[in-house]
From Swiss-Prot:
Pathways involved: Amino-acid biosynthesis; L-lysine biosynthesis via DAP pathway; LL-2,6-diaminopimelate from (S)-tetrahydrodipicolinate (acetylase route): step 1/3
Chain's role: Catalyzes the transfer of an acetyl group from acetyl-CoA to tetrahydrodipicolinate.
Reactions catalysed according to its record: (S)-2,3,4,5-tetrahydrodipicolinate + acetyl-CoA + H2O = L-2-acetamido-6-oxoheptanedioate + CoA
Recorded GO MF terms: tetrahydrodipicolinate N-acetyltransferase activity
EC annotation from Swiss-Prot or TrEMBL: 2.3.1.89
Record organism: Clostridium botulinum (strain Loch Maree / Type A3)
Enzyme kind, highest EC tier: transferase
InterPro entries: DapH (IPR019873), DapH_N (IPR013710), Hexapep (IPR001451), Hexapep_transf_CS (IPR018357), Trans_hexapeptide_repeat (IPR050179), Trimer_LpxA-like_sf (IPR011004)
Protein name per UniProt: 2,3,4,5-tetrahydropyridine-2,6-dicarboxylate N-acetyltransferase
GO terms (BP aspect): diaminopimelate biosynthetic process; lysine biosynthetic process via diaminopimelate
Gene: dapH
Length: 236
């Protein structure tokens, strides 16, 4: 089955039709040598077992063998999840603990994803861009190169309410902490969005906007560039 993940309705269909998963980890002390571990990843030494698999399969084993189990601990971090997390092993970027990045996301070279950041399906993070702590990039949100998305800022997605046009943040844009970029908005190259702003209309290149709703307050000048410059050392 193929899906056009540039269409919000197709993304919703993909999520609807995806096999939902409730994976768990079980740490068990007991006599389970006669159990059927088909479809379960098992590691054991003697009576100590570590099991990885779907909850309904592992829980059946635990219930059927409860008289043979001395101790059991279960860890779970999701329920009926439709989209797996991104495989980050081969990505050349700095991704800190606690960042949540769903599958089918593009992460550019030398970008930085900080603790607590959330990046949804179909989003694109450009080369050298930083997504700061607790910032959110919604479905199909597009961040260009050398963007700084401040702590707690939100780039809205296309899913709910559905929008055919994703948010587009062009190169060298700085978005301050807790700013909100609404659905389908485009921020032009080199512009600055002040902290706490709510951006409801497109922003041209090389301007500073502030307020709720955000309005242009000036053009980017030398002083603005000095106050908003990025640190290359954070991206190495």
């Amino acid at each position: 089955m193929s899906y056009n993940l540039t269409d919000p309705y197709e993304i919703a269909r993909y999520i609807k039709e995806a096999k939902k998963s409730t994976p768990i980890k079980a740490y068990i002390e007991g006599e389970l040598s006669n159990c059927d571990f088909t479809n379960i990843e098992k590691f054991n030494s003697g009576d100590l077992y570590i099991l990885f698999g779907e909850s309904e399969e592992i829980l059946v084993i635990i219930e059927k063998n409860k008289d043979k189990i001395k101790n059991c601990r279960i860890e779970q971090d999701r329920r009926k999840s439709a989209i797996p997390l991104l495989d980050m092993l081969k990505i050349n970027a700095r991704i800190e603990p606690g960042a949540i990045i769903r599958d089918k996301v593009i992460i550019g070279e030398n970008s930085v994803i900080m603790m607590g950041a959330v990046i949804n399906i179909g989003a694109e993070i450009g080369e050298g861009t930083m997504v700061d702590m607790n910032a959110v990039v919604g479905a199909r949100g597009k961040l260009g190169k050398n963007v700084h998305l401040g702590a707690g800022a939100v780039v809205a997605g296309v899913l709910e309410p559905p929008s055919s046009d994703p948010c587009t943040i062009e190169d060298n844009v700085l978005i301050g902490a807790n700013a909100v970029i609404l659905e389908g908005i485009k921020i032009g190259k080199g512009s600055v969005v002040a902290a706490g702003s709510i951006v409801t209309t497109d922003v041209p290149e090389n301007v500073v906007v502030a307020g709720a709703p955000a309005k242009i307050i000036k053009e980017v000048d030398v002083k603005t560039k000095d106050k908003t410059k990025l640190l290359d050392d954070l991206r190495k």
